Swiss-Prot record:
It comes from Buchnera aphidicola subsp. Cinara cedri (strain Cc). Its EC number is 2.8.4.3. [4Fe-4S] cluster binds at C147, C151, C154. This is tRNA-2-methylthio-N(6)-dimethylallyladenosine synthase. PANTHER family: CDK5 REGULATORY SUBUNIT-ASSOCIATED PROTEIN 1, MITOCHONDRIAL TRNA METHYLTHIOTRANSFERASE CDK5RAP1.
Length: 435
């Protein structure tokens, strides 16, 4: 989400025709930091970066420094107390106001804070027919923001606000424009995409997430549809049925389970059991036997015993996850879990995290050995070897292979011939036919 928000910020500033985007802080007049508050480590990175920028501002007092994102909402004026040289604090829902905030900051010469939540106005600045985008063939499209789940470990409802869904027609319009600009693959974004629900008062119809998937599947030249992030509670039969009826939905699903222990899931306030999660996966695998399932895991959650952890390891094997985002539990302010006794030592947390990552890497290795033929969306020329192209498989694996640059932006069939660093794949073109 933050990566996509950063691209929206870039589009907003470009539209003013007042700014040239650069990645070199030393030549910049304005420095913007878009932050994440999911984990404490990410939050501390903010202040490390601000420390580096402070030196630039000491050399040039006219530089404006703006801090946005979820940490901006979470901490507000507290950021200024630790870094009194910053000029603007803005939230994820107010990033569309940034041009005005920059002008105001130049006039006032004092701290400006604008972190109001529950607004979708920033999406007025997404892709349209007049937008120039870099040549790319896969793109993100946000369909909703916020979350109503209030999991005990998660700060998102406090920083992004409650669930708000975009107008389905505006989403479709944005994707149509992306397809006209060469995009072949769409990833739908939201803190809980399954909760998407838009009420069209004019037509007196409610649009669900599955309704949206069917509408997107009808757009020409959009050949792959992905989505993140899903919540098991709202992963209903209509969404499962969509996997049967929409071939464009990739054989890849990111469905966070967080733990393999029902006791821990209850403490996390996740609202489902391991049995319910497994039932969802089994239904999908019955429709799509070759689908790859990815998950999130929080390791060392307060109260997690060795037995709870072993249940997680067992569940990883049972579902056969081949990708995960696994992290050590990070206490976040205002959350219910922050009041629980954190009784797992850091040394033990690190050991458990290593075991989870090793287990999933082993399963990923087995998938790579089995999956000899893949259809790949070719995205460009390798930075490390200009003789090679690179692309991504349905389950989001990067593949490098020798081929003609004319394949870029198209799909081609490859044979996987080797594994590179247990992350990247090496491929060989089966046929020069592309589509």
């Amino acid at each position: 989400m933050n990566e996509h928000d950063s691209s929206i910020i870039e589009n907003i500033l470009k539209k003013t025709n007042l700014y040239i985007i650069t990645k070199k802080p030393e030549i910049s007049d304005i420095l913007i930091l878009n932050t994440c508050s999911i984990r404490e480590k990410a939050q501390e990175k903010l202040f490390h970066q601000l420390g580096r920028w402070k030196k630039l501002k000491q050399k040039n007092s006219k530089i404006l420094i703006a801090v946005g994102g979820c940490v901006a909402v979470q901490e507000g004026k507290k950021i200024y107390k630790r870094a009194k040289f910053i000029d603007i604090i803005f939230g994820p829902q107010t990033l569309h106001k940034l041009p005005k905030l920059l002008i105001e900051s130049n006039k006032k010469k004092s701290l400006i804070i604008n972190i109001k939540k529950k607004s979708l106005k920033k999406f007025n600045y997404t892709i349209n027919k007049n937008t120039n985008i870099k040549k790319k063939f896969s793109s993100f499209v946000t369909i909703m923001e916020g979350c109503n789940k209030y999991c005990s470990f998660c700060i998102v409802p406090y920083t992004r606000g409650k669930e708000v869904s975009r107008n389905n027609k505006k989403i479709i319009s944005e994707i149509i424009e992306l397809s006209k600009k060469g995009v072949r693959e769409i990833t739908l974004l939201g803190q809980n995409v399954n909760a998407y629900k838009f009420s069209d008062t004019f037509n007196k119809k409610n649009y669900s997430f599955s309704d949206l998937l069917y509408s997107i599947s009808e757009i020409p030249r959009i050949d792959r549809i992905r989505f993140i992030t899903s919540h098991p509670v709202e992963f209903n039969n209509n969404i499962i049925e969509a996997y049967k009826k929409i071939p464009k939905l990739t054989n890849f699903l990111h469905l966070p389970v967080q733990s393999g222990s029902n006791k821990i899931l209850k403490l996390m306030k996740r609202g489902y059991t391991i049995e319910k999660y497994e039932n969802i996966v089994n239904k999908i695998k019955k429709i799509r036997p070759k689908i790859n399932i990815s998950s999130d895991f929080i390791i060392g959650f307060p109260g997690e015993t060795k037995e709870d952890f072993q249940k997680t390891i067992y569940f990883i094997s049972k579902i056969n996850f081949d990708t995960s985002y696994s992290f050590i539990y990070s206490k976040r302010p205002r959350t219910r879990a922050s009041k629980l006794e954190d009784n797992v030592t850091m040394e033990e947390k690190k050991k458990r995290l290593y075991k989870v990552q090793q287990k999933i890497n082993q399963q990923a290795f087995q998938w790579k050995r089995r999956s000899t033929e893949q259809i790949v969306l070719v995205e460009g020329i390798s930075k490390n070897n200009i003789q090679e192209l690179y692309g991504r498989t349905e389950n989001n694996r990067t593949v490098f292979f020798e081929g003609n640059p004319k394949f870029i932006g198209n799909f081609i069939k490859l044979k996987i011939i080797s594994i590179k660093y247990n992350t990247f794949l090496k491929g060989k073109i089966i046929s020069n036919n592309y589509f």
